Amino acid sequence: MTVAAIILAASPEGALRAIDSRPLVRRLAEAAWSGGGVPVVVVAADPDGAVAAALAGAQVTLAEPAPREAGPVAQICRGIDVARGLVTETEAAVVWPARMAWVDPETLTSLIEAHGTDPEPVIRPAFEGTPGWPVLLPVAHLEALRALRPDRMPDELLDDLAAAGVPFRTLEVGDPGTTHDLATEREDLPPYAGPPEPASGHAHEWGSVAAETADDAPLPGPTIAPWEPAPGR
């Protein structure tokens, strides 16, 4: 089972925003890789190479965005198309807006494990009953997503998919990072609880990486992946 992680940065400035002295996009790429996303694709404009430099040494593919006028739906589809070009066996993608900076890698793992036992629905994480992001989208629903209007924002796109009959599932993960974005400082987040029970029946060995791991602690093994621009939507 191969599940990609698609990180969506709205601008180079947002991608490079310093979070505890590290570029946001680097933090997210490492979290996605640690949580089991393969491949990890970052969709971000990079006019001067600064985003690529921030990702150097990470196991990640940097993809040129679709045209801005094509809307959020095209950016999501762009990332998934690139992931499928890299790994044709990709079955699903975790769509991760970069503003959701505090998501724990365990949440990604929980989404992937849940997809393994229940592969049909779109899976949305929840914290204390409130649905959030990132969202796991099976590629079987990619064309339904691609058909949606370019003026729809990410939450509205999910509503449109549900209205079109795409099945959804909400997964409680106990991660405040799924519902609190960069408008909330990390020290102001509610306590991390973790999932009430593992999706696959076994406990993960890590805890809240956002709360317990030093931000300058490197992850082993990542290298920058080559990439080629794919056609926009």
Residue spans for each PLM region:
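Conserved alpha/beta core of the MobA/IspD/sugar-nucleotide pyrophosphorylase nucleotidyltransferase superfamily
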Residues: 149-233
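Conserved beta-loop-beta/alpha segment of the NTase-like Rossmann-fold superfamily
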Residues: 63-146
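N-terminal glycine-rich phosphate-binding loop and ensuing alpha1 helix
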Residues: 1-49, 232
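Short, surface-exposed acidic-centric catalytic microdomains
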Residues: 33, 41-78
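Residues at secondary-structure transition points
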Residues: 14-19, 23, 46, 66-74, ...
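Short beta-strand segments
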Residues: 7-9, 96-97, 125-126, 171-174
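Alpha-helical structural signal in soluble globular domains
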Residues: 31, 35, 53-58, 82, ...
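Structural element of the ATP-grasp superfamily
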Residues: 25, 142, 154-158
